[in-house]
Amino acid sequence: MLSIERLGVGRGGQMVASGIDLCIEAGWALQIHGANGSGKTTLLRVLAGLMPPAGGQVSWYGANVRAHPEKFRRDLAFVGHANGVNDDLTVLENLRFATLLGAGSGAPDGTSSVPASGRSGVAAPPSRRDMLARAGMLPLQHTRAGCLSQGQRRRVALARLMLDRKPLWLLDEPGDALDDSASGWLHECLALHMQDGGIVVATTHRSLQTPAARTRHLHLERSGAWLD
């Protein structure tokens, strides 16, 4: 469970959002909406523990993410605008590297903050080859990532998410640069992750197709932040 308590978010010395209170349970999604410059990416970075909040706190299963960063990061997968893909590695090597880093949920002892009841285990771990096929990247598996288009790099970054299987996904505009086919695959990945008890928090200019009954929407506007 990701808990946000009286959270304030600032940028450039100015408050862009304040007083945000909500809890995101296992199997749920939060979509963050707002115009350019509204603070969506800043808020996501605060939730990831990459920036300090201007007020309040963020907790992961009861532990403050700033006070216990190692405990939090073992369960966190963050994909920003830069994708985090290594240009010097091939597509397949990027996935192999991600699998090695994600072994045991990133924890030396294989532990996680998520209780067993929080993950259903419905989705079986896909193979790298299967994931590349689903992403439409199998013909390019031996191509260096630096030679890929932005949309193809985005597919590689999203494929790593499914292989890594971290319980919390923080995604900055995950649908950017994706064509209709890749967008459909993205929405399938999000639904499978939630079905398996994972949490999705994503900024987006347009609504993502996550299960409506388990999705909340946070809107950032000049007048303040509001939930529906």
Swiss-Prot record:
KW Nucleotide-binding (keyword) present: yes
GO cellular component: plasma membrane
PROSITE patterns on file: ABC_TRANSPORTER_1, ABC_TRANSPORTER_2, CCMA
Reactions catalysed, as given in the entry: heme b(in) + ATP + H2O = heme b(out) + ADP + phosphate + H(+)
Localization in the cell: Cell inner membrane
UniProt EC number: 7.6.2.5
Chain spans, region Disordered: 106-126
Ranges where the ABC transporter domain occurs: 2-227
Family: Belongs to the ABC transporter superfamily. CcmA exporter (TC 3.A.1.107) family.
Protein known as: Cytochrome c biogenesis ATP-binding export protein CcmA
Species this protein is from: Paraburkholderia xenovorans (strain LB400)
Gene behind the chain: ccmA
